Amino acid sequence: VPEIYEGTIEIKSVARDPGSRAKICVHSQDSSIDPVGACVGMRGSRVQTIVNELHGEKIDIIKWTEDLPTLISESLSPAEIQKVLIDQDNKRIDIILTEENLSKAIGRRGQNVRLASKLTNYEIDILTDKEDSERRQAEFKDRTETLIKNLEVDETLGQLLVSEGFVSIDEIAQAEPENISKIDAIDEETAQELISR
């Protein structure tokens, strides 16, 4: 591809399963150039030359972007992603999608998700929307039970605190009384008592 050789188009990332499939992220500083179109060529002529050179290895060419959710969605194509949850600290991404898109996102023997993971340098977990809902319900229940046990509050108050974003004992201990008392059914005195526990 002449544009790559000339430096007009830059290869940002490559992930390969040699002999089977490759994913390549390309980018151009020149907004008038479509990096994917330039690499694919007229009716696929440019990419087909490379595919033939690699003895039939399939090549997915993806437009690189700094927007990680978009890059992940593109790299897991043709699956349609509902939600992307990113944990920058642990370099992990949770992908939420429908049951119908699960096999597309994972690919044969996990190839699609494995290559997307290599391409982005993030560990990727794929969950159906049902699994995500069950996980969030379990987390909510665990957090509520922790508050009930450690703060000696009833279930309603525990659920209320968790639903308002106070998900740990430390968060409550470090909170200002006026932030907790903004919650319906909690006055300043109760808030102060919760913080002191």
Language-model-detected regions and their locations in the chain:
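RNA-contacting regions in translation and RNA-metabolism proteins
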Residues: V1-R197
